[in-house]
Amino acid sequence: MTTPRMLWDISAPVHAGSPVFPGDTPYSQQWCATIGPQCPVNVSALAMSPHVGTHADAPLHYDPQGATIGDVPLDAFIGPCRVIHAIGRGPLVAWEHIAHALGADRPALPQRVLVRTYERMPLDRWDAALAAYAPDTIERLADLGVVLVGIDTASIDPADSKSLDSHQVIRRRGLRVLENLVLDEVPEGDYELIALPLKLTTADASPVRAVLRTPA
């Protein structure tokens, strides 16, 4: 009998108390209709930055001529990936912090790499001291054929960055990015990633419901 494939939900919960980048629009919800004698349904209206919670950035986020998230091909967001632990490493995740999971004695590197930096991701507060990717780390991953990088913090760049150097590497190398992943319970290793963005035709990012499955 086939062993069931284990599933990890690596998405942050989204609600009014979800952390938000300073200046971004937090999550809010208003009820437009509620079930009652004259109404058979509940209907709400949502307002939020598309960067609240676990999300995929579109090229438009860091390139004025970049594609919207609705125009980004989906292939990078589904497929084999490797989760690498760099817990407590920062402010920048350097190559030496992830090299232990990339050695010649390991299986071939999948095209998607997710890095865990938190022991426990802060789901109820903004972390201005978040860990980010060193730009050279992304360059070297791209050289190895990686098409998507992810991290369990709110940005692949430091929170106070004005140049967004790692985002500019993503732009130049044509990579995709996932941010605000929840990797607290996920062991290092290889998985199948499924994290599809919504087809928002004018947006600079999209929420995703990101999950990992053990390989078939």
UniProtKB/Swiss-Prot annotation:
Known catalytic reactions: N-formyl-L-kynurenine + H2O = L-kynurenine + formate + H(+)
Pathway of action: Amino-acid degradation; L-tryptophan degradation via kynurenine pathway; L-kynurenine from L-tryptophan: step 2/2
Cofactor: Zn(2+)
InterPro entries: KFase/CYL, KFase_sf, Kynurenine_formamidase_bac
Active site: H61 (proton donor/acceptor)
MF term (GO), any: formamidase activity
EC number(s) reported in the record: 3.5.1.9
Binding annotation for Zn(2+) 2: D57, H167, E179
Gene3D superfamilies for the chain: Putative cyclase
Binding-site residues for Zn(2+) 1, renumbered to this chain: H51, H55, D57, E179
Assembly, per entry: Homodimer.
Similarity comment text for this entry: Belongs to the Cyclase 1 superfamily. KynB family.
Alphabetical list of PANTHER family matching this protein: CYCLASE-LIKE PROTEIN 2, KYNURENINE FORMAMIDASE
Protein name in UniProt: Kynurenine formamidase
